[in-house]
A protein has these predicted regions:
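Short secondary-structure junctions and interdomain/linker hinges
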Residues: 51, 55, 59, 154, ...
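Acidic/His-rich, divalent-metal-binding segments that scaffold phosphate/diphosphate chemistry
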Residues: 2-121
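C-terminal effector/catalytic modules and regulatory tails appended to multi-domain proteins
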Residues: 2-22, 37-41, 211-357
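Generic detection of long, well-ordered alpha-helical segments
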Residues: 68-72, 141, 187, 269, ...
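Divalent metal-dependent catalytic cores for phosphoryl transfer on phosphate-bearing substrates
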Residues: 92-237
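Extended interaction regions within the primary functional domain
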Residues: 54-58, 142-148, 158, 225, ...
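A broad, structural surface signal
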Residues: 76-83, 128, 149, 274, ...
Length: 357
């Protein structure tokens, strides 16, 4: 039986309107891009996202939900990051080209579909899956490469271990399809940060939380989703993350695997702190590509400790760039030839050489 899908989000409705009123701004002017998008979403929901839970459970873990509802959450979050739902005179979505809306939405649809095959390296399956689900759409090879790269860049590592997937996968930051320019790195950053900020209570697997034998690493991820309350402030350029934690959870110790096959102990508040640090790194990374368009200046997090439905303590923290900045590499480390002695030896005569002339 087909999965129920919705295409009613503001971002999806923006695509529908653009196809109807600005058909000339798409590679093909046949007005079918929204229909193609809808059919691809249905296909992905039925064949891939309907089985991600079972596929992920094969390793024994109980991950947070990766079904089509998570895809809709990422679409909703991306819309909020672009200014939908905010009282702004200059929302970022107005600066998107019509075809960019299509590429962004399609990349979001693809970003987690590979989990139906295997969690490790799932992002690398984007191109293969797009080929399979978009056979009847007429997308050309260049469209396939651009859109699948945007989807793939939402996570993972490059072969050299680098997490800078956006730069590595999109050598050309603004490729074009004919006369249509696509801000590929910008779109990839939107997908990546929207995915990071789409944790919410609907992703939590409460059966896994209550079931005996659920691995602690899965419990932590599900508790995190269950207790987080996110809010995107487009006008204030801030991300707000509140965590309402029951006092009974504070002393509990969880055992999580380490890379050497051993385990280490961690408490839930410390796990939240680690996740916040990762979220802040993602914000700073994605801001490189979102600057001047839809960047965010800070994450404002807050712990609310609850006992018998009564708030007994609040701990706020702001994550943002403060103080005088440092450089990870010097100019000479970035470019060894930016060196006085090297350039002198390469282009200038020594005193002895001048005397010999």
């Amino acid at each position: 039986m087909p999965e129920n899908i919705s295409v009613s989000s503001p971002l999806e409705q923006l695509l529908k309107k653009a196809v109807r009123t600005q058909g000339g701004k798409f590679p093909r002017r046949n007005g079918t891009y929204f229909d193609h998008y809808t059919s691809i979403k249905q296909r992905l929901a039925d064949k891939y996202y309907a089985v991600t839970g079972a596929a992920l459970a094969q390793t024994g873990d109980r991950y947070t939900k990766h079904d089509i509802s998570h895809v809709d959450d990422v679409i909703e979050t991306a819309g909020l990051m672009l200014g939908f739902g905010h009282d702004s005179h200059n929302p970022a979505y107005k600066n998107l080209e019509p075809y960019e809306v299509f590429a962004l939405l399609l990349a979001i649809l693809l970003h987690d579909a590979g989990n139906a095959i295997r969690r490790q390296g799932h992002e690398k399956k984007a191109a293969e899956i797009l080929r399979e689900v978009a056979t009847a759409t007429g997308l050309n090879d260049l469209e396939h490469r651009i859109i699948s790269s945007i989807a793939q860049a939402h996570g993972g590592e490059m072969p050299d271990g680098s997490k800078d997937t956006i730069t590595a996968l999109m050598k050309d930051p603004e490729p074009n399809i004919g006369k249509i320019k696509i801000h590929a790195r910008r779109l990839a950053a939107l997908v990546r940060l929207a995915d990071e900020l789409s944790e919410n209570y609907t992703r939590a697997d409460e059966v896994a939380i209550e079931a005996p034998g659920t691995p602690d690493v899965s419990l932590l991820a599900n508790y995190y989703c269950l207790l987080i309350n996110p809010r995107i402030d487009f006008v204030g350029k801030s991300v707000h993350l509140a965590f309402h934690v029951d006092v009974k959870l504070l002393p509990r110790v969880f055992k999580i695997p380490k890379g050497d096959g051993q385990t280490e102990d961690i408490m839930f508040i410390d796990y939240i702190a680690q996740r916040l640090e990762k979220c802040e790194r993602e914000r700073r990374y994605c801001n490189r590509f979102l600057a001047g368009f839809a960047s965010f200046d800070r994450i404002r997090a807050k712990l609310v400790i609850v006992d018998n439905n009564r708030e007994i303590d609040t701990v706020p923290v702001d994550l943002e760039e403060v103080g005088y900045p440092s450089l990870s590499k010097t100019v000479k480390e970035l470019e060894p030839n930016f060196d006085a002695c090297r350039l002198r030896n390469k282009h200038s005569l020594t005193a002895e050489q001048e005397q010999g002339q």
